[in-house]
Amino acid sequence: MTTAARPTFEPARGGRGKGESDLSQLSKQYSSRDLPSHTKIKYRQTTQDAPEEVRSRDFRRELEERERVAVRDKNRDRPTREHTSSVSKKPRLDQIPAANLDADDPLTDEDADEDSDEDSDDDTAALLAELEKIKKERAEEQVRKELEQKAEEERIRMENILSGNPLLNLTGPAAQSQASFKVKRRWDDDVVFKNCAKGVDEMKKRQDKRFVNDTLRSEFHKKFMEKYVK
C-alpha cells in the first residue's frame, strides 16, 4: 500500500538527524523518491524492429509469403465447406425439369446457389409487394377516416345552426315549438330583496309580494317550504 497520501506530521529539520549537531546547517535527509530515475536511454533490442534489422528485411517478400499461406489455408478448408453446403442446399423437385431428373447426376454448388438466389429474389419481390399493399390499405383507411370525420363535423355544425335559430327550429314537436317563443321568467323574479328600493305605495299594491325583513316569514320562504319540504 502506498504511503504517498499520508500527511507528514513530523517534517525533517536541520540539526536533528544522525550526526547533525549544528542547527544552522540544512538537513541532509531526503526521500528515495527524490533520487534521479531513468538515467539511461533504452535502445531497441534485437527482436524489437531495430533500425539495422529493418534495413535488411524485404517487406514485399514477407507480404507475398503471408498471402500465399493464407490462400493455401483457405483452399485447404474449401472441400469441407463445399460438401456441407451441397448437403444442406438441395434444389427443389419443382424447379428441376423432368428431362434432367437423374439419380446419378450430382448436385453442384452453382445450381444450389442459383436456386437460392432465385428463391431470395422471389421472396424479396413478394415482401415488397405485400409491403406496398399494406401501405396502400393504410392510406385508403386514413382517407376514409378523414372523410367520415369531416362529414360528422359538418352534421354537428348544421345541427347547431338549426337548433340555435328559433325561426328555423320549427320541425320539432308542437309543444316545443310553442314553448320556444314564450318568454321565460327570470330566475330572480321571486327573490326576497329584489324590489327593496321601490316605493312603499307600489309594495302595498302587491299584497302577495309584500316586503318582509324576516326571511322566515317571506313569501319566497313560504313557497320554497311548500314546494320542497311539505
From Swiss-Prot:
Biased composition (Polar residues): 22-34
A GO-annotated cellular component: nucleus
Alphabetical keyword list: Coiled coil, mRNA processing, mRNA splicing, Nucleus, Spliceosome
Composition skew (Basic and acidic residues), residue ranges: 52-84
GO biological processes: mRNA cis splicing, via spliceosome; mRNA splicing, via spliceosome
Pfam families in the cross-refs: Cwf_Cwc_15 (PF04889)
Subcellular location: Nucleus
Coiled coil ranges: 121-165
Extent of Acidic residues compositional bias: 102-124
Major subcellular site: nucleus
Region Disordered, annotated ranges: 1-126
Single GO MF descriptor: RNA binding
Subunit structure: Identified in the spliceosome C complex. Component of the minor spliceosome, which splices U12-type introns.
Described purpose of this protein according to its UniProt entry: Involved in pre-mRNA splicing as component of the spliceosome.
Protein name (Swiss-Prot/TrEMBL): Protein CWC15 homolog B
Organism, as annotated: Xenopus laevis (African clawed frog)
